[in-house]
């Protein structure tokens, strides 16, 4: 059971067994055009999930108009500005939500800034799994700030 509340997302394990989770959200943001975007608060390197290689984040984001799927180990913040819509969007996603994915799917004029607790296949390999003890809860926090630049 998942619930989104002002104080975060609460995942409740109502079983008699410890439960592993890998959790992510997929907020989509409408954009004016890919060429009008400026990204910041990102690490130097990222994982191109399509090719499964480590790459320079800025080099990859320069190809956002072609479609990207980038996983980043962030500082807990991911941001972009849309110069035409005159807005700045900041995803605040502290540990354990500090993995970030930037995803685009042209020609749709949108991007996703996604907070994740662990990368793909983590339920298989156990990397960064969160274990919720029997009859316990886990609270995850993330927020989105949208600032007008007018």
Sequence positions of predicted segments:
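Glycine-rich active-site loops that engage anionic ligands at enzyme catalytic sites
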Residues: 82-120
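Surface-exposed, gly/pro-biased binding rims or lids
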Residues: 43-51, 114-132
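Active-site/ligand-binding surface loops and adjacent short beta/alpha elements
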Residues: 17-20, 27-94
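A short, structured loop/turn motif at beta-sheet edges
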Residues: 1-3, 31-33, 83-84, 104-108, ...
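Short coil/turn motifs at secondary-structure junctions
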Residues: 14-16, 32, 118-120, 147-149
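Intrinsic-disorder/low-complexity, polar/charged segments enriched in Ser/Thr/Lys/Arg/Asp/Glu/Gln
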Residues: 4-8, 77, 86, 137-141
């Amino acid at each position: 059971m998942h619930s989104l509340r002002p104080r975060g997302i609460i995942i409740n394990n109502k079983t008699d067994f410890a439960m592993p989770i890998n959790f992510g959200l997929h907020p989509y943001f409408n954009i004016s055009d890919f060429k009008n975007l400026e990204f910041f608060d990102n690490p130097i390197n990222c994982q191109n999930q399509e090719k499964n290689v480590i790459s320079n984040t800025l080099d990859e984001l320069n190809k956002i108009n072609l479609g990207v799927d980038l996983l980043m180990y962030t500082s807990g913040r991911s941001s972009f500005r849309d110069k035409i819509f005159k807005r700045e969007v900041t995803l605040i996603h502290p540990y354990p939500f500090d993995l970030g994915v930037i995803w685009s799917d042209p020609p749709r004029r949108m991007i996703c800034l996604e907070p994740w607790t662990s990368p793909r296949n983590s339920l298989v390999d156990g990397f960064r799994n969160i274990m919720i003890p029997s009859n316990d809860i886990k609270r995850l926090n993330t927020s989105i700030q949208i600032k007008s630049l007018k």
